[in-house]
């Protein structure tokens, strides 16, 4: 049974305002979603926080999120807290997210980690459409469970898909399936004793592979690597035994990117 009477929806559309900074052009949301007004931590980079006024996702919860980042906008989107997926019993919780990043626009999508509780089943599907001049940082951090309770890999199933298109041509696809019933997630080809996993994609970002590699090597408690995709963009995969090392690594990379992206002419 869905916690809410209908599918939870969030719509956000941005544009460049009179002062030359990214502002909200239009928005709409249903419970539990809310949006904070944008603030500007640096130059013309806007930051908007997505809020979910709920204890987490339950069985039957379905979220439909659509984000349209207007041309020339520079925006960072964050979440309010760690996302919890509760025991979904014999069902599942799901999220479909569609993101459009306009010409010469920059989006840094940086949510907090996702924590699947015991017997949680979650399905996530994200599609991102870019123009050739769009810039993107997109990440997800997945936790093995409630680590402090030693509840590791007790969830039912977690399946997330990320599809990125540039001028309608596919340039990146990630299909993550974590199923403790069929796979030993602690084996050396999976988590290998770690409990937190970062997946970060960088498209058209002003940072070299060597710079990202240096960030990883300097990050204490992180085991990770960066690779170049066939379309010459970057993908980072990293493991750690806590959220903080991965959040710090992600922030370090994002800071290097935005130092260039937000420079005013």
UniProtKB/Swiss-Prot annotation:
Localization per record: Cytoplasm
Intrachain S-S bonds: none
Principal location class: cytoplasm
UniProt entry keywords in alphabetical sequence: Chaperone, Cytoplasm, Nickel insertion, Virulence
GO MF annotation terms: nickel cation binding
CC terms in the record's Gene Ontology section: cytoplasm
Loss of function: phenotype: Cells do not express urease.
Classification via PANTHER family: UREASE ACCESSORY PROTEIN D (PTHR33643:SF1)
Family classification: Belongs to the UreD family.
Chain's role: Required for maturation of urease via the functional incorporation of the urease nickel metallocenter.
Oligomeric and partner information: UreH, UreF and UreG form a complex that acts as a GTP-hydrolysis-dependent molecular chaperone, activating the urease apoprotein by helping to assemble the nickel containing metallocenter of UreC. The UreE protein probably delivers the nickel.
Protein name: Urease accessory protein UreH
Organism placement in taxonomy: Bacteria, Pseudomonadati, Campylobacterota, Epsilonproteobacteria, Campylobacterales
Gene (name only): ureH
């Amino acid at each position: 049974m869905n916690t809410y009477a209908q599918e939870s929806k969030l719509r956000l559309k941005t544009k460049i305002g009179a002062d030359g900074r990214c502002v909200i052009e239009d928005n709409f949301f249903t419970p539990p979603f809310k949006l904070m007004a944008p603030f500007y931590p640096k130059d013309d980079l806007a930051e908007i926080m997505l809020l979910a006024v709920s204890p987490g996702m339950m069985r039957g919860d379905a979220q439909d999120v659509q984000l349209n980042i207007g041309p020339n906008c520079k925006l960072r989107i964050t979440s309010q807290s760690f996302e919890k997926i509760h025991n979904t019993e014999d069902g599942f919780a799901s999220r479909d997210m569609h993101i459009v990043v306009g010409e010469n626009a920059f989006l840094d999508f940086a949510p907090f980690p996702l924590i699947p509780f015991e017997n949680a089943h979650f399905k996530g599907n994200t599609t991102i459409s870019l123009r050739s001049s769009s810039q993107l940082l997109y990440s997800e951090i997945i936790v093995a469970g409630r680590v402090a309770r030693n509840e590791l890999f007790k969830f039912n199933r977690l399946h997330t898909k990320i599809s990125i298109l540039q001028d309608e041509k596919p340039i990146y696809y990630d299909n993550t399936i974590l199923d403790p019933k069929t796979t030993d997630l602690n084996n050396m080809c999976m988590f290998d004793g770690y409990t937190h996993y970062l997946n970060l994609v960088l498209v058209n970002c002003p940072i070299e592979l060597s710079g990202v590699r240096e960030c990883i090597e300097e990050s204490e408690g992180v085991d990770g690597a960066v690779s170049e995709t066939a379309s010459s963009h970057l993908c980072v995969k990293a493991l750690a035994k806590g959220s903080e090392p991965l959040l710090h690594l992600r922030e370090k990379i994002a800071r290097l990117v935005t130092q260039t992206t937000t420079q005013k002419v």
